[in-house]
Amino acid sequence: MNRRQFIQTSGTLVAGGALASLTGCATWGGGRKPWFEISLAEWSLHRSIRNEKKLTNLDFPKVAKQEFGLNAIEYVNQFFMDKARDVAYLKELKSVCEGEGVRSVLIMCDGEGNLGDALEERRQKAVTNHHKWAEAAKFLGCHSIRVNAATGNVGSFEEQQKRAADGLARLGEYCAQLGLNAIVENHGGLSSHGAWLAGVMRMVNQPNVGTLPDFGNFYINRQTNEEYDRYQGTEELMPFAKGVSAKSHDFDEAGNEKNTDYRRMLKIVKKAGYRGYVGIEYEGSGLNEYDGIRATKKLLETVRAELA
């Protein structure tokens, strides 16, 4: 199957529901829909998948549903890096999702080059490298691919903004042809500077290019522990958000996350009018991965009910 056939085949998965897909919202059969739904980011299981080899990417939908009662998932491309254009593999993955009643929400894409590279040739190569993941995301029924506004830390604040906007605009145009969003996470460097990334979004000014605010990824420089205010940053990024990542590490005896005030954070999310998925991304070591996911889910459910 060539790329054109691949896109045409996957198009049937989006037809009839493209508008709903772009917002990340889904309807529940009967009952009142909560103001946000909970998804599971695959990175929450990175030790089980990457380090301990206890799970594979094909196990992920089943684990999300059977272990945690979650019916929406966010993939990490690192865990099936050589499968982006493996149609048989993607069909199997889609079949597993359908069997479990699990929706594929997005693919988090890393390792494909800097979309804001200082060299135009490398910047374009990074854009092209992401095409296969956009195609895979469409095939699986995702509404977005999550990408990085990486610049290599070359140039001034404004120069890096312009280059990131250029790469994202090019990728956004390609994703638009597929009915997909390209969304940027605050993920280190200047992308963790809320005002910088919000400025990039305004430069791009495309409806399908947005953000994925992560509650905890506001470290501009981890070596020096330079950190942007996470609440200010989230507030600055929420107007462009098409996904939200609920990062968690440690919990107190009451079940609250020690590093992030989830009530304050989710008030910001709700005030912005966001009604899509909030993805669990447990990254701590105090609890095992499964218990950390459960603790994050419980906290999200508690605060969601309080703010309803």
Question: Which residues fall in each region the model found?
Answer:
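Residues at the N-termini of beta-strands
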Residues: 72, 144, 243, 276-277
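Basic- and aromatic-lined ligand-binding clefts that recognize polyanionic substrates
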Residues: 175-208, 220-223
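Short strand-turn motif at the edge of the Rossmann-like AdoMet-binding core
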Residues: 186-187, 216, 282-283
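N-terminal pre-domain/capping segments
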Residues: 2-139, 155-162, 166-169, 176, ...
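A short helix->loop->beta-strand "cap" motif at the edges of active sites that frequently abuts
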Residues: 102, 180, 272-276
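Substrate-binding/catalytic cleft of secreted carbohydrate-active enzymes
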Residues: 221-231, 259
